[in-house]
Amino acid sequence: MIWKQPPRRMGEMGGSLSRRFGNAAASWAVWRVSRSCFSLLFFFYFFLFFSSSSLLPTTNNYQHLQLHSLIPTLNTTAHLPHQQASSASMKASLFLACSALGLALATPTQDAPETVNNPLGIVYQAKLPETSRTGIRGTINATAHSSGRGVVFNLDLWGFDNTEGPFRKLHTCFDQTNKQTNKIVKLTTTTAYHIHVDPVPTDGSCGPTKDHLDPFGRGQTPPCDDSLPQTCEPGDLSGKFGRLTTSSMEEHFNQTFHDLYTSTRPGLGTFFGNRSIVIHHRNSTRLTCANFTLVEQPGTSTTYVPRPTGTGIISSIFPTGTGAISTSGHAPTISATYTPTPTPSPPAQNNGAGRLVGFSLGAIMAALVPLAL
């Protein structure tokens, strides 16, 4: 007797096999597409790394740092075994979509240009006020370098040996007779200070000063690399020249430095004459702050400086040469020799093409996500 399978059961078995082989084929196809997209995006990033600045004017050191962190991830996940094709394809598509959209939506940034033609003889000063929040007092003076290239800052701060605060701590001790004594212990810590965007209001609160002076959209992460100061926020002075450190503090803390990326010329985004400086606690809260005011101007009386406008991009003559800064006393003595050399204007910082490519990649990669699910 020949056994015959009912047509209904045969249909179910055929459908099951069809679904099994169909899903396997679909997984294989999605895996191949995802791997191809990995390769495409890898070569796109490779092109960003090695293209000349004339082709990609917005590809600067800061963007290279961000893109470089993505390459190891791409290289590792692009060679998964075939057995993991289904889950890998989904993760790959999601990662590619997010990374491409993140690249597209990122705020356009550029390295800060050196400031030139800063007016000579003008001095801006920020004087830290008397406040119950901290005993830190002092002044920060700023004037253009004698070459007109950048700004020389001179810090004279004191009050770090107050009873309580970020640099000292009050310890209660007991001697052999059980007599209580108080001892001030010096803490090993560092404190940041920055130029902030807005001035301090009349009530003296440091909160409304907003964020650091950052006209080029760099942001606070990753942290400033002092070996590449042009990639830092122009207002991040402690990031570029070092924090206030207790190990070097006695009665006064004095420091003089030449910053090439801030300006005393009104109208530029890097102008700080109507902004503020903020000193932070070691836990990043704002300890004290003060406004910069014009205290010296050659040949004229002190006048109000209007709020700056513009992008801070400089197109002018860039002097070359060396300068020497002396830190004797509270007023810096600066000498410099330089020869102005005309150079071409920097290229226009237009990120439209890069953002268009990013959005296109993001759309393509996002379309792969439903295939992987």
UniProtKB/Swiss-Prot annotation:
Record's catalysed reaction(s): 2 superoxide + 2 H(+) = H2O2 + O2
Induction info: Expression is down-regulated in presence of human keratinocytes.
The keyword Secreted is annotated on this UniProt entry: yes
UniProt keyword tRNA processing, yes or no: no
UniProt-annotated binding residues for Cu cation: 194, 196, 212, 280
Alphabetized UniProt keyword annotations: Antioxidant, Cell membrane, Cell wall, Copper, Disulfide bond, Glycoprotein, GPI-anchor, Lipoprotein, Membrane, Metal-binding, Oxidoreductase, Secreted, Signal, Virulence
Segments for region (Disordered): 329-348
GO CC annotation, single: side of membrane
Free-text remark on how the cofactor is bound: Binds 1 copper ion per subunit.
Quaternary structure and interacting proteins, as annotated: Monomer.
Name of the protein in question: Cell surface Cu-only superoxide dismutase ARB_03674
